[in-house]
From Swiss-Prot:
InterPro entries: Aldolase_TIM (IPR013785), Elp3/MiaA/NifB-like_rSAM (IPR006638), LIAS_N (IPR031691), Lipoyl_synth (IPR003698), rSAM (IPR007197)
Domain of life (superkingdom): Bacteria
GO molecular function: 4 iron, 4 sulfur cluster binding; lipoate synthase activity; metal ion binding
Protein family membership: Belongs to the radical SAM superfamily. Lipoyl synthase family.
Name used for this protein in its record: Lipoyl synthase
Organism: Azotobacter vinelandii (strain DJ / ATCC BAA-1303)
Principal location class: cytoplasm
Amino acids binding [4Fe-4S] cluster 2: C98, C102, C105
Length: 325
């Protein structure tokens, strides 16, 4: 019996700065997650070795030193070892507590702390210390902010460019739900080199997998940015294995091209825990290759498609391919 049933009171509000994960995180979403008895056995093609190299530890220590978060760690990315060992990282700004409860994601939910005004400078110093040539900046959703965090993104870009003018910058932004105009006005004034926003899955699965988000809104966000800053490539991605069909994936790819999205990533969804959405299928590498061929035929400037692909995986190579470098 729930606390509400026994006391007649609503559950207490989560205190600011408290991070909910797993079952606590997804307890109040509209379509309930049924915990799986055990995680599915992964096929051979998506098993990865997590190297514990000195370079990985050095980057982790540097992130802690500058009070920064990497999405590589927070989202339990399977490529963490490869990317960290290669001296790269995708930075997650605006804290590590998200205002959304997406049941596929391993980032914690709650009431976020106020923005750290020193974060843009700390991030810029870390990028300079690591001598990075290509940086991806993403964030948690911040529905508590008037601009959804767009100004904080812009401040981070500006500070990095001041210390590392040769570094290319890609932003992987939230959907700015209800804040599109103000967020894009700010973004257009300090645009990234690549503007990325993930659709994540097909429209039919949005209610179960992206509560609080809207498929058409996300498409419109990408198109609206493109109209403001035509020279900057736009990018989006899908996770496969949530219950979509191949035909639905192709249809979403067509919709992306109709909205002038330049770059596409497709990867396998991996269930972070028993309390997250269950994997419905493991897509074979040959199918990922077929999607890439179809995407190239549709006119995407770059398609990166494979079981271990994530939005920021080899992002520098994707961007160079899109720009014809």
């Amino acid at each position: 019996m729930s606390t509400t049933e026994t006391t007649g009171k609503s559950p207490a509000k989560v205190e600011t700065g408290v991070k909910l994960r797993g079952a606590e995180k997804v307890a109040r979403i509209p379509v309930k997650v049924i915990p799986t008895e055990e995680l599915p056995r992964k096929p051979d093609w998506i098993r990865v070795r997590m190297p514990a190299s000195p370079e990985v530890e050095r980057i982790k220590q540097l992130l802690r030193q500058h009070k920064l978060h990497s999405v590589c760690e927070e989202a339990s990315c399977p490529n963490l070892g490869e990317c960290f060992a290669g001296g790269t990282a995708t930075f997650m700004i605006m804290g590590d507590i998200c205002t959304r409860r997406c049941p596929f994601c391993d980032v914690g939910h709650g009431r976020p702390n106020p923005l750290d005004p020193d974060e843009p400078k700390n991030l810029a110093v870390a990028v300079a210390d690591l001598r990075l040539k290509y940086v991806v900046i993403t964030s948690v959703d911040r529905d508590d902010l008037r601009d959804g965090g767009a100004q904080h993104f812009a401040d981070c870009l500006r500070e990095i460019r001041r210390l590392s003018p040769g570094t290319q910058l890609e932003t992987l932004v939230p959907d700015y739900r209800g804040r599109m105009e103000i967020a894009l006005d700010i973004t257009a004034a300090e645009p990234p080199d690549v503007f990325n926003h993930n659709l994540e899955t097909v429209p039919r699965l949005y209610k179960a997998s992206r509560p609080g988000a809207d498929f058409e809104w996300s498409l419109d966000l990408l198109e609206a940015f493109k109209k403001r800053v035509p020279a900057v490539p736009t990018k989006s991605g899908l996770m496969l294995g949530l219950g979509e069909t191949d035909e639905e994936v192709i249809e979403v790819m067509k919709r992306m091209r109709e909205h002038e999205i330049d770059m596409l990533t497709l990867g396998q969804y991996l269930q972070p825990s028993r309390n997250h959405l269950a994997v419905q299928r493991f897509v074979h590498p040959d199918t990922f290759a077929w999607f890439a061929e179809e995407g190239e035929r549709m006119g995407f400037k770059n398609v990166t498609s494979g079981p271990l692909v994530r939005s920021s995986y080899h992002a520098d190579q994707q961007a160079h391919g899109a720009k014809g470098d």
